Structures are given as C-alpha cells and as structure tokens.
C-alpha cells in the first residue's frame, strides 16, 4: 500500500552567503517521504536560486503532481532537475538501491579569511584538499591568496571555483600571482572564464587544470577528453535524476576524468544522501559537500559531528 508525505521548509542562512550577486537569506525547499508497506524513502527538492531553472514554487507544484501520480501507481519521474533528483532519491531509498555507506569527508570550503582555512587544514587527517571560491574579489587578490595557501601548506591540493567570473585578461592576472612551481597542486579550477573556449585557452597557457561544472547543464555539452581538462563537478540537484547522475559519472570515468559529487547548498538530509551517492558512485574521490556551516539548523537527518540543532519532521510544514 503506497502512501506519501510532502513537507515544506525554510532554513535561515548565515549573513554572508552570496550567490550570483544576490544574498541568500534563507534556504527554501521540500521533502518527500514515500512509503510502500514497511519500507520508506526520503528525498529533498531544493532548487538553488540563480542556478536552477525552476523556482521553489514551480518545484512544489511539480512534486505534488508527481506524488499524486505515484500514489496511483505511476512509475515515471518529473522533468524538473531538482524534483527529478529528490523523487529518484526517495525511490532509491524505498527500493534499497541507494547504499547506506557514506563518505562524510568533505573538502573544507574557504569563502573568506584564508587563515581560518589554514587552521582547519592543520587538523585534517590524510590528504589535504580544500576548495576556494575565486572570482568574488579582484583576480590579483585571488591569486595571492591561493599562492599563500599553497606556500603555507606544502602537501595541500586546492580545488578552485570561479563560476565563469573572469575575462581571459582577469584569468591571466590571477595566474600571474600563482608561482608556477605550485600550479600542479591546483587539482582543478572550475570554469575560469565566461566561455568554454576561453577556459580551454587559459588551461593551455597557464598549465592550470580546469574542470567543467555549469557546462554539463548546457545543451551542446559533450563529454570529451581534452587537453587541460581534468575533472567534472556534478551537482545532482541541478542535474536531475539519480540515473542521469550515474550516466554522467560513468561518462567522465570512461575518459579518465575525475568526477566530483558536489553540493547545491542542500539541507543536512540532502547532504547525507549526497555523501552516500559519493561513496557509491565516486569512491576514493573527496566530495564537495562542505556547505552545512552556511546554515543555522539541520533537519530530519543530522550530519555526523555537526553541533547545529536538528529539527524533526513534526516541526516542518506538511503539505500532504
């Protein structure tokens, strides 16, 4: 016997979270809980403002329609990426497809003071990998900060993310301030320039490896082995169903590219599922999931070791 519940939620964010030039004051989303007999599966649907094509309201309408169809026996999935991902996660839990084993390691994310990152990395066991957002300040400053971190911690490897912020000139200004001897320890720089061709040119000219992120969601993108391209960053909330995520990971691995499962600032429930997906599909690759500290609370399922309060389902607004 099938049954379902849908919840709507809103989590206050820390004051300094800025996405695409807009301040994110709250993270808004939905949960779906599917039941079939004794089995249960959860999924999170949380479109990311400025990145997702669909709004929270559109996702809610699509989710409620899909849930009603599922209750009537339908086996299809919604088309909106965030809804398809959340629905497919709930189904994967319900049917036991999504393994319980998780990779709760996370590459620490530096969005502000590099000294904070140095302190966090000092206590980090094993390989030291961190992520730094670049492109928010002057390119020269970004280059100096990256150089400082690589100089201060000799066994550090950095993942950088520019979100297509730079012109070719600005990208070159950044590279100019990174010691050529350190550049090999930049694991990759996500989408440095506004166009793929400019990003490819940057990789050739500087020797700094790049990764595709936004490009994966463009209609003309194809997986290819290219000079200077080392990785793809897969954000499931922006990608779509679990099957589509699996297809992209497989396509990347077939070309020898690193595939990194990455957060779209999901709640703790969504992040714990991403940790399981990473352990399942990209074992041995550190996922990019260090975003929980941007929020003021957890929900339903806590992230191991987090001191943030965790709300229970009874405290959320139920829609169905």
Swiss-Prot record:
One example of a Gene Ontology biological process annotation: menaquinone biosynthetic process
Any coiled-coil regions, as ranges: none
Pathway terms, separated by semicolons: Quinol/quinone metabolism; 1,4-dihydroxy-2-naphthoate biosynthesis; 1,4-dihydroxy-2-naphthoate from chorismate: step 4/7; Quinol/quinone metabolism; menaquinone biosynthesis
Reactions the enzyme catalyzes: (1R,6R)-6-hydroxy-2-succinyl-cyclohexa-2,4-diene-1-carboxylate = 2-succinylbenzoate + H2O
Binding locations of Mg(2+): 161, 190, 213
PANTHER family per UniProt: O-SUCCINYLBENZOATE SYNTHASE (PTHR48073:SF2), O-SUCCINYLBENZOATE SYNTHASE-RELATED (PTHR48073)
The protein's name: o-succinylbenzoate synthase
UniProt source species: Salmonella paratyphi C (strain RKS4594)
Native organism taxonomy: Bacteria, Pseudomonadati, Pseudomonadota, Gammaproteobacteria, Enterobacterales
Gene, per the UniProt record: menC
């Amino acid at each position: 016997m099938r049954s379902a519940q849908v919840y709507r939620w809103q989590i206050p964010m820390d004051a300094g979270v800025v996405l695409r030039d807009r301040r994110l004051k709250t993270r808004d989303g939905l949960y779906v809980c599917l039941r079939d007999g004794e089995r249960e599966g959860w999924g999170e649907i949380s479109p990311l403002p400025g990145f997702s094509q669909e709004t929270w309201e559109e996702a809610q309408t699509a989710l409620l329609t899909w849930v009603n169809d599922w209750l009537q026996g339908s086996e299809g999935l919604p088309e909106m990426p965030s809804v398809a991902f959340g629905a497919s996660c709930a189904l994967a839990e319900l049917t036991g497809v999504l393994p319980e084993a998780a990779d709760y390691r996370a590459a620490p994310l530096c969005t502000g003071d590099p000294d904070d990152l140095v302190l966090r990395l000092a206590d980090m066991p094993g390989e030291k990998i961190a992520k730094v957002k670049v492109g928010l300040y002057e390119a020269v400053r970004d280059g100096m900060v990256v150089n400082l971190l690589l100089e201060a911690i000799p066994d550090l490897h950095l993942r950088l993310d520019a979100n297509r912020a730079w012109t070719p000139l600005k990208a070159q200004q950044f590279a100019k301030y990174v010691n050529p001897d350190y550049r090999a320890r930049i694991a990759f720089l996500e989408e440095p320039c506004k166009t793929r061709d400019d990003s490819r040119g940057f990789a050739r000219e500087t020797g700094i490896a790049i990764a595709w992120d936004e490009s994966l969601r463009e209609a003309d993108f194809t997986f290819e082995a290219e000079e200077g391209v080392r990785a793809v960053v897969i954000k499931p909330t922006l990608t779509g169903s679990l099957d589509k995520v699996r297809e992209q990971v497989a396509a990347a691995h077939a070309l020898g590219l690193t595939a990194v499962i990455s957060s779209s600032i999901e709640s703790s429930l969504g992040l714990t599922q991403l940790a399981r997906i990473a352990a399942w599909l990209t074992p041995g690759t550190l996922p990019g999931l260090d975003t929980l500290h941007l929020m003021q609370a957890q929900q339903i399922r806590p992230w191991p070791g987090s001191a943030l309060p965790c709300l229970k389902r009874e405290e959320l607004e139920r829609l169905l």
